[in-house]
């Protein structure tokens, strides 16, 4: 089901814009095109691209709407799924298809290993394996910028839960790359870097969220027995 907070976060991030992996043993959601780049065709593309990153196949979904302005560099939004979700789930949840189409923005949904991300000390397969997911996202950005006409001063991050904490980690570690972050339902799980250059960040939480608490960064896992 699509949720109104997701729509709100999406609209918020786009207002900022306009103002300025899976396991190798499992199938890939949505299929793949294999490793390699696409031709420099800018409009009407919707594809999954994969590459080998640190000896693992990692994939992401790119959507370039027909409304992209071919005569100008355009914004890029990376929309990062939460723990146990997939890039397809996040795409359906956030509705960035419609928003990207309406505003001529390139949207990307990365896929985490075992449907998870290493965003800090808690609590996912990718974190336990200490995967370099910040390096992965930066390499995805480089590939999308190389293949499409992207305004590198308008690269934005959003995400849900585990994807929100990874978005904040990316902003903390690489504030020179990203223009702003708007995400939901998690916190920065690292200490602020001394060389961090502040960028706009909006973090959205629900008062009735019983897992990622509004009041602090403790995580409460309910007993499901």
Residue spans for each PLM region:
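Hydrophobic alpha-helical segments
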Residues: 1-26
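A domain-start/cap signature at the N-terminus of enzymes
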Residues: 21-76, 102, 129, 158-184, ...
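Gly/Ser-rich "nucleophile elbow"/oxyanion-hole loop immediately N-terminal to the catalytic nucleophile
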Residues: 66-72, 118-162, 172
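Short substrate-entry loop that stabilizes the transition state in hydrolases
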Residues: 68-117, 178, 184, 190-191, ...
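Extracytoplasmic/secreted envelope proteins and their assembly/folding machinery
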Residues: 77-80, 93-97, 134, 138-141, ...
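Short alpha-helix in the alpha/beta-hydrolase fold that links the catalytic acid
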Residues: 92-93, 213-225
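Short, proline-enriched alpha-helix->beta-strand connector loops that line the catalytic pocket
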Residues: 196-201
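Short beta-strand/loop motif that positions the catalytic acidic residue
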Residues: 203-205
């Amino acid at each position: 089901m699509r949720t109104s907070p997701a729509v709100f976060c999406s609209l918020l991030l786009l207002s900022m814009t306009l103002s300025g992996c899976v396991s190798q043993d499992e199938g890939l959601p949505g299929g793949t095109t294999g490793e390699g780049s696409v031709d420099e065709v800018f409009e009407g593309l919707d594809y999954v691209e994969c590459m080998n990153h640190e000896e693992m196949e990692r994939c992401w979904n790119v959507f370039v709407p027909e409304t992209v302005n071919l005569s100008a560099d355009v914004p890029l939004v990376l929309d990062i799924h939460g723990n146990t979700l997939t890039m397809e789930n996040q795409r359906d949840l956030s509705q960035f298809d419609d928003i990207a189409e309406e505003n001529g923005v390139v949207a990307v949904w990365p896929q985490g290993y075992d449907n998870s991300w290493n965003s800090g000390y808690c609590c996912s397969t990718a974190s336990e394996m200490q995967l370099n997911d910040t390096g992965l996202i930066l390499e995805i950005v480089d590939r999308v910028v190389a293949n499409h006409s992207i305004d590198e001063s308008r690269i934005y991050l959003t995400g849900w839960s585990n994807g929100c904490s990874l978005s904040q980690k990316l902003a903390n570690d690489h504030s020179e790359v990203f223009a702003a972050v708007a995400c939901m339902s998690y916190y920065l799980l690292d200490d602020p870097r001394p060389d961090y250059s502040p960028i706009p960040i909006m973090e959205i939480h629900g008062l009735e969220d019983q897992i990622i608490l509004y009041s602090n960064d403790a995580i409460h896992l309910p007993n499901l027995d």
